[in-house]
Design a protein with these regions (language model features):
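Generic N-terminal targeting/processing segments that precede catalytic cores or assembly contacts
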Residues: 1-371
Length: 371
């Protein structure tokens, strides 16, 4: 299994959903970087299960225990290792269906790849529970980015076809983004909360689930971060986004809508703003040629419906090599979207840290050469 990311801001995640613990090792963190434990705990609480009626009944405190790399609230420069204990597992819920593959899950693909040796309980290492270490790493990254004036935030753009307003692609600001983080159900239009919650409740009552869309933005990102082709901002963010189990699509700026525009509509006209340059629109989501252009970086991620549903589903029993019917017991989210908001913020923070560090390394190597 490949459980690592990055060349500069390096992550390795570990653990399984029903194992003793999950966690992450962050390497490359500058010595002296601030580690605000209260801030980190607040971000972890936003993702933690059991905090909202739309979420699973499995309650986990997601309390982080830092094992190395920190002292007196600062990074020491050594690898930062954080562990989160799994304190509320019910593995018995999975004993009766170990050989029956859950549709929509990684059960069958993982069974084939790892020859049945992987831990299937709660999805094992494939579980969305492994996004908790990503939120820890993302919180550390966000603290670094805040020192550079970069703020990140996100909101629920849609659930089950009920749509929130979109970010102002030019005018979204840090105050708006910080305000969203104070809500368990972050929306730009609060009137959309009731119909969204109703859609989730209806799915739960029908022993089903629903998906949605999350829109994420970063402001304060300077122009010139990223590289063309394989080091593009879109490439790095997308790699991390698709590492989140529920994400099935991602779009930057106007995304697929750009395909229906003419160039005269899609191009972001530019003008001088004091000594700097700004764009009059932001159809490209703050990125052109794979490099940030100084506008807000904005993307949307599609979150599929939670695959664990209580209604009967057709599947196969790999032990008996026959068709079967599966009814999934256990505690599952009828909608993962509200808890995934902070996860999307975290992966954007990790990506921007990696990109900023890569840019700093390149500039350090070429200092005094390209003059």
């Amino acid at each position: 299994m490949r459980a690592n990311f990055g060349e500069h801001f390096k992550l390795t995640i570990f653990g399984e959903s029903h194992g003793p613990a999950i966690g992450v090792v962050v390497d490359g963190l500058p010595a002296g970087a601030r580690l605000d434990e209260d801030y980190i705990a607040g971000q972890m609480a936003r993702r933690a299960p059991g905090g909202d009626p739309t979420a699973t009944a499995r309650k986990e405190a997601d309390a982080v225990r830092i094992l190395s790399g920190a002292m007196n609230g600062r990074a020491t420069g050594a690898p930062l290792c954080a562990m989160i204990e799994n304190t509320n597992t019910r593995s018995g819920d999975y004993a009766s269906m170990a050989a029956r593959m859950r549709p929509g899950h990684a059960d069958y693909a993982g069974y084939v790849k790892y020859r049945g040796m992987n831990d299937p309980r709660g999805g094992g290492h494939f579980s969305g529970r492994l996004t908790a270490p990503l939120v820890f790493a993302g919180s550390v990254a966000r603290l670094l980015l805040r020192e550079k004036g970069i703020e990140i935030g996100a909101h629920i753009a849609a659930i089950a076809g009920e749509r929130d307003a979109r970010f102002d692609p030019v005018g979204v600001d840090a105050r708006t983004l910080c305000g969203l983080a104070r809500s368990r159900f972050p929306l730009l239009n609060p009137e959309k909360e009731a119909p969204m919650r109703r859609a989730v409740a209806e799915a739960r009552a029908a022993q089903d689930s629903v998906g949605g869309v999350i829109e994420c933005a970063a402001v304060g990102v300077r122009a010139g971060v990223g590289s063309p082709f394989f080091g593009s901002v879109e490439s790095v963010v997308s790699q991390l986004a698709f590492s989140v189990p529920a994400v099935k699509a991602i779009a930057f700026g106007d995304g697929m809508e750009l395909a229906e525009m003419r160039g005269s509509e899609a191009n972001d006209a530019m003008r001088m703003d004091g000594d700097g340059v700004t764009c009059e629109s932001n159809h490209n989501g703050g990125v052109t040629g794979g490099i940030t252009n100084g506008m807000p970086v904005i993307f949307r991620a599609a979150i599929k419906p939670t695959p664990s549903i209580a209604r009967a589903q057709r599947t196969v029993d790999v032990a008996k090599r026959e068709n079967a019917v599966l009814e999934i017991a256990g505690r599952h989210d009828p909608c993962i979207v509200p808890r995934a908001v902070v996860v999307m913020e975290s992966i954007l923070a990790i990506a921007l840290c990696e990109l900023e560090m890569d840019d700093a390394a390149q500039r350090a190597l070429t200092e005094g050469v390209c003059t």
